[in-house]
Amino acid sequence: GGYYFPKISGLITSLTASIQNRAGSWRQLSNEGDTPIQTRTYAQMWFNHGLNPTNGKYAYILLPNRTQAQTQTYSQNSGIQILALSNSVHAIKEIVSGIIGANFYGPGNISFINSLNQSSVILKEKDGILDFSAADPVQNQDLLTFELTKNAKSVISKDSKITIVSLSPIKFTVNTTNALGKSFNIKFEL
């Protein structure tokens, strides 16, 4: 697999990498582990943030099962746009498909999406259809609320835990009580 580190203004890009042999036993980590010493080779990567960094930011994309050549090709044209990389939200858009993925670490907004809670969302708008999925990744909230700066003609489908507040503009809630991080989906006709 590979890693891609976007070169974006304001991001830390000084990556250091090393390969090391490390030795130790499970017993050294806990009183219950095995005692034989095991030696393994590990790769390690880190960004040097310096001492006491303020708002240090970096971004990377995991590319599982990609060869070195495929990773190099991807780095020339990733097709990914970083929409937000702030304390309140991290969001990306896959340019060709138009899919947006976002993690809100509290109330925040990106593009046309306003989340009033911590949440994870993934959505796609195509041919007048907005397909929107949301989850409570921290699994401790009972209700997620979303406000979109778009109007909908109708709801095509929705999970039963979603309540429509308004279609113009779009506003809805997601009941995540005991959902254990499950995603809930709604589709709008725009």
Give the location of each predicted region.
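Non-catalytic terminal regions with compositionally biased, polar/charged low complexity
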Residues: 63-190
